[in-house]
């Protein structure tokens, strides 16, 4: 797996950027210069690609301890694949930053200058002063306000290899391509269409037990206002329109450091429940509001590639505007779950809970949907005609054909002449076209590109 290292002097926002990219609070962040002195690592996803993100200690010659940190940072940088050098956009460039940057540039690796804390027009004007670093790749960010990250991700994506996010997916696809005959319909795995497994997840005290009780219309789980009352996962089934929906009520996920004893076991059990679920109800507290822990749990759902419905519970107590809230979730907090429907309910009063049952059936139908190969290829043909594939350094890029090779979740292979040239933005365009035509609401859609006549996903 390729690695991305964040380097810079203390207090430029490395840990904040690390947490933002990792979608969870791992590194300690504060306004005190030099809070992070140890190297932190975590695996991240940038679009359809994986990478190891490394948060280095701050570089500062003025502190004896930091001399060792700098030495270790440079060592890690030599072993990394991509370097992001952070500076503080509130301050003018200094020679020390330039020296650090030039020493890293000599390593011959992809390197970008990231100017953080660019929060307003005045900061943008000041950022021009960093042009004398002599680097083409400069990105203005405001990590605090989540501004500028999309451009940075787009640049990083160019240097990352295509990897599947689902375990063993590589082997599954290669086995499929070995025996698949172009133009033929594929015999999919059998999925029980009459039994749906639904995991209910969320942080502590968002109302998961109350929601379960409302869904099955009986007091099955112990409901209390005390945070973390439900410890043991509880299964309950309900028949809706001749379909058996099996619900699992999970223990709430607490913040790190507060997980003790049975609660720690329950967190591990939540992972297991998701691994055996097909659809997740991600429950949020619309009265209390959302936080970074909600994002972490959402990331857990995305990691398992489940169908998902975002449930805004306690809506009767909320003062939020529904449309603005949905926009915030899809464009900011949960960009990676933008395909998920959002439903507001009040579990205690039972208001709008019935809507969830119909929506679960619909999402499950999308989750197990089979696209006819001829219809899929007609769509791809029309999409590429409307917006032709960009050339790859002057060479023509072609999609020979497309085929769905799995379901639950749906997975589509694009057989191409130059699969590595398929930019993530064009892949996203194709995903949007497929979603629009075949209705994949609430469902992750996996698209893989492969070279025709080869098991390799490159041009060699």
UniProtKB/Swiss-Prot annotation:
Binding site for GTP 2: 202-209, 249-253, 313-316
Keyword Cell inner membrane: no
KH-like domain ranges (all copies): 369-453
Self-association state and partner proteins as the record states: Associates with the 50S ribosomal subunit.
Family named by the database record: Belongs to the TRAFAC class TrmE-Era-EngA-EngB-Septin-like GTPase superfamily. EngA (Der) GTPase family.
Reported function: GTPase that plays an essential role in the late steps of ribosome biogenesis.
Protein name as annotated: GTPase Der
Biological source species: Campylobacter jejuni subsp. jejuni serotype O:2 (strain ATCC 700819 / NCTC 11168)
């Amino acid at each position: 797996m390729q690695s991305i290292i964040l380097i810079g002097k203390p207090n430029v926002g490395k840990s904040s950027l690390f947490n933002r990219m990792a979608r969870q609070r791992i590194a300690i962040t504060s306004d005190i210069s030099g809070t992070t002195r140890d190297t932190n690592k975590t695996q991240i996803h940038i679009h359809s690609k994986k990478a190891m993100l490394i948060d280095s200690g701050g570089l500062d010659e003025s502190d004896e301890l930091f001399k060792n940190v700098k030495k270790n940072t440079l060592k890690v940088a030599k072993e990394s694949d991509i370097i992001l050098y952070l500076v503080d956009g509130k301050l003018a460039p200094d020679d020390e930053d330039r020296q650090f940057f030039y020493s890293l540039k000599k390593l011959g690796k992809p390197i970008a200058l990231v100017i953080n804390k660019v929060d307003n027009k005045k900061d943008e004007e000041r950022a021009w002063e960093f042009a004398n670093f002599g680097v083409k790749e400069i990105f203005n960010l405001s990590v605090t306000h989540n501004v500028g990250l999309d451009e940075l991700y787009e640049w990083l994506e160019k240097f990352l290899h295509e990897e599947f996010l689902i375990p063993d997916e590589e082997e599954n696809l290669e086995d499929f391509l070995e025996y698949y005959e172009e133009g033929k319909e594929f015999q999919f795995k059998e999925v029980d269409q009459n039994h749906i497994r639904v995991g209910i997840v969320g942080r502590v005290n968002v109302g998961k037990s109350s929601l379960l009780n409302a869904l099955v219309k009986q007091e099955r789980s112990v409901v209390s206002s005390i945070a973390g009352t439900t410890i043991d996962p509880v299964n309950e089934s309900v028949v809706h329109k001749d379909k058996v929906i099996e619900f699992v009520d999970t223990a709430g996920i607490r913040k790190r450091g507060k997980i003790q004893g049975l609660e720690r076991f329950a967190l591990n059990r939540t992972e297991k429940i998701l691994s055996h679920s097909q659809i997740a109800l991600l429950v949020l507290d619309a009265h209390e509001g959302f936080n970074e822990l909600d994002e972490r749990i959402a990331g857990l759902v995305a990691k398992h590639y489940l169908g998902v419905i975002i449930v805004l519970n306690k809506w009767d107590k909320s003062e939020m505007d529904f449309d603005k809230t949905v926009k915030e979730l899809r464009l900011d907090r949960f960009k990676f779950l933008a395909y998920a429907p959002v439903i507001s309910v009040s579990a205690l009063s039972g208001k709008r809970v019935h809507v969830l049952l119909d929506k679960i059936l619909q999402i499950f139908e999308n989750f197990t949907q089979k696209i006819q190969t001829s219809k899929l290829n007609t769509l791809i043909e029309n999409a590429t005609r409307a917006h032709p594939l960009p050339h790859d350094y002057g060479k023509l890029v072609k999609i020979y054909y497309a085929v769905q090779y799995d379901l639950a979740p749906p997975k589509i292979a694009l057989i191409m002449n130059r699969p590595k040239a398929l930019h993530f933005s064009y892949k996203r365009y194709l995903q949007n076209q497929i979603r629009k035509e075949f209705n994949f609401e609430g469902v992750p859609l996996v698209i893989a590109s492969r070279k025709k006549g080869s098991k390799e996903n490159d041009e060699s």
